[in-house]
Amino acid sequence: MADFDAVLKCWGPVEADYTTIGGLVLTRLFKEHPETQKLFPKFAGIAQADIAGNAAVSAHGATVLKKLGELLKAKGSHAAILKPLANSHATKHKIPINNFKLISEVLVKVMHEKAGLDAGGQTALRNVMGIIIADLEANYKELGFSG
C-alpha cells in the first residue's frame, strides 16, 4: 500500500497531461527497444524519426497511462481492472509479458524526468509494477498464454 501511495504522490503531472507523457513513454520504449514497435500494428510502418510527436502514438500512450492510473488507484485491489486487460493483451494483441517489464523501466525514467519521481519513488514504482505484472502473468497462465 505504501508503494502505491508513493507513486500516486507523483502521479499528478502524469494525470495532468496523459497525452504528452504517454507519447514520451511509447517513443522512448520504441527507441530503446525497437522490437516492441512491431507489436503495435498501427505503428509498425512509422519511421523511428517520426515516432516522437506522432498523434496516434501519443493517444495510445495516453490510453496506457490512464489504465495504469486506474490500477494505481486500486492499490492492489485491481483484479476487475486487470482481467479484461490481460484477456485482450494475451488473446488479441499477443503481447509477451516481458514487454510490460520493458515499459515499466521506461516509465520509471520518464516519471523521474517529468514528474519528479525520486529514488524512493522509483523503487516504489518498480515494486508496484512488479505486483501488477505478476498478476497479469497469472491471468495469462489461466488463459493458456505463455507470453
Curated annotation (Swiss-Prot):
Q: Which residues form a coiled coil?
A: none
GO MF terms listed in the record are: heme binding; metal ion binding; nitrite reductase activity; oxygen binding; oxygen carrier activity; peroxidase activity
For this record, an example GO cellular component is: sarcoplasm
Which Pfam families has this protein been placed in? Globin
EC primary class: oxidoreductase
Q: How does it assemble?
A: Monomeric.
Q: Which PANTHER family match?
A: MYOGLOBIN
Protein name (database record)? Myoglobin
Q: Which organism is it from?
A: Thunnus thynnus
